[in-house]
Regions:
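N-terminal amphipathic/basic leader segments beginning at the initiator methionine
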Residues: 1-38
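Conserved, well-structured core segments that form the ligand-binding/active-site neighborhood
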Residues: 110-226
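A glycine-rich helix N-cap at a beta->alpha junction
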Residues: 103-124, 286-296, 301-304
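Short glycine-rich or small-residue beta-strand-to-loop segments that form or flank ligand, phosphate
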Residues: 53-64, 88-93, 231-233
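Short acidic-hydrophobic, aromatic-tinged amphipathic segments that line or gate anion-handling sites
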Residues: 33-40, 116-120, 326-335
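Glycine-rich phosphate/diphosphate-binding loops that line cofactor/substrate pockets in enzymes
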Residues: 41-59, 79-85, 222-229, 256-258, ...
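Glycine-rich phosphate/diphosphate-binding loops and the adjacent beta-loop-alpha structural elements
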Residues: 196-206, 226-245, 255
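C-terminal non-catalytic interaction/assembly regions of soluble proteins
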Residues: 78, 88-90, 246-247, 251-360
Length: 360
């Protein structure tokens, strides 16, 4: 019997594990590496835009896949002769911290440095009963660009959720809120949204609901047998830059592993643990703060009574033992060997490629 190699994203590189063919392995993929779309997805957005109108592209960075769409969108703005000084690139991400966002996209968008606006760099003003960033209100054309992906605390965040979490609109918005629907329609928000291997575009009111339903169809995976061991990465850099931003993946996986089973999280955490608020919660085991990272941590802490967690990470082992009572390893091979010591080679190993919500 031979060995099969399985690869995982780890920071800016990839790491692999060799698993003997006599082990029961089930591989799941929701990575949808190819996004299929016709250029008309982009061109039709601008068909109703008049020359001289000011344009805001609200780019909410959620995966490495939408950067190419952003570049195509900017190329279309240029091809149609719209003035560069009328373009604003409203750039945000609630899935990674602001310093990493600025470094990542500052590089990608270098020629457009002067057009970039971050949510924390400008004032909000009241519009239709909600606090909204000035650049959104002051622009005549508003185009949202992102992906819908599952999140271990939020499930499937709506576009309204993502604008709120990123800081473009005030905190009063909740899902299904009439407030958001009214704002969406009054601002005539347009959008391009990636879901799995497909792309939606047009006015948000035309496709937002369908787009959320499609995300649930594509990323929710029903599991027949709960595994003894799950191995999953967090998407590599920048999504695995800190423990705070990676931990929600544990919650996505917990439905796919049996009680007493092991979730093996492969997350480099090159930038360490995360924000001060998160670090305080991690060491004090108090979860008063309402941040997304702390909510993910609380869920993981609750889960650890029933399931085990181990990590392949750059975070010192002593910290993982002290805070999460979990083991840290240098390689996926070492983590798996540890798993086999607990469950023997008869274990069912589930390998998950991409973000997925596992349910029974």
């Amino acid at each position: 019997l031979g060995l099969t190699e399985y690869w995982f994203r780890y920071g800016v590189t990839e790491v692999f594990v060799d698993i003997s063919d006599e082990v029961r392995v089930e591989k799941l993929s929701t990575a949808y590496s190819n996004v299929r779309y016709d250029y008309s997805v982009i061109s039709k957005i601008f068909d109703g835009v008049a020359e001289g109108e000011s344009i805001a592209i609200i780019f909410d960075y959620a995966s490495n896949r939408e950067v190419d769409l952003l570049k195509s969108l900017i190329a279309e703005v240029e091809a149609r002769g719209f003035e560069k000084n009328k373009l604003k690139l409203l750039t945000s991400s609630w899935r990674i911290n602001s310093k990493i966002l600025e470094e990542e996209l500052g590089e990608v968008l270098k020629p457009y440095r002067g057009c970039i606006v971050y949510p924390w760099s400008e004032d909000k003003t009241e519009y239709s009963g909600v606090m909204v960033s000035r650049s959104i209100i002051d622009s005549q054309v508003r185009i949202y660009l992102s992906s819908i992906l599952p999140h271990g605390v939020l499930g499937y965040p709506s576009i309204g959720d993502s604008l709120r979490l990123s800081g473009w609109v005030g905190n009063g918005l909740v899902r299904d809120d009439d407030c958001w629907l009214k704002l969406r329609d009054e601002l005539n928000l347009m959008g391009i949204c990636i879901v799995g291997d497909g792309v939606y575009s047009g006015y948000l009111y035309e496709f937002e609901d369908e787009c959320l339903r499609d995300a649930e169809r594509k990323y929710t995976v029903k599991i027949k047998d709960e595994a003894d061991i799950i191995l999953v990465d967090c998407g590599g850099w920048p999504w695995d830059s800190t423990l705070e931003d990676s931990l929600h993946v544990v919650n996505l996986m917990c439905g796919g592993v049996k009680d007493g089973g092991l979730i093996g999280l492969i997350s480099e955490c090159r930038e360490g643990l995360g924000s001060n608020v998160f670090i305080k919660a991690l060491f004090s085991h108090s979860f008063e703060e309402d941040s997304l990272g702390v909510k993910a941590l609380k869920r993981v802490a609750d889960l650890l009574g029933r399931k085990k967690l181990a990590l392949v990470t750059a975070i010192p082992r002593s910290i993982l033992e002290k805070t999460l009572h979990s083991k840290g390893f240098d390689t996926v091979q070492d983590l798996l060997t540890y798993g086999f010591r607990m469950y023997s080679k008869q274990a069912l190993v589930r390998i998950v490629d991409g973000l997925a919500w596992l349910t029974k």
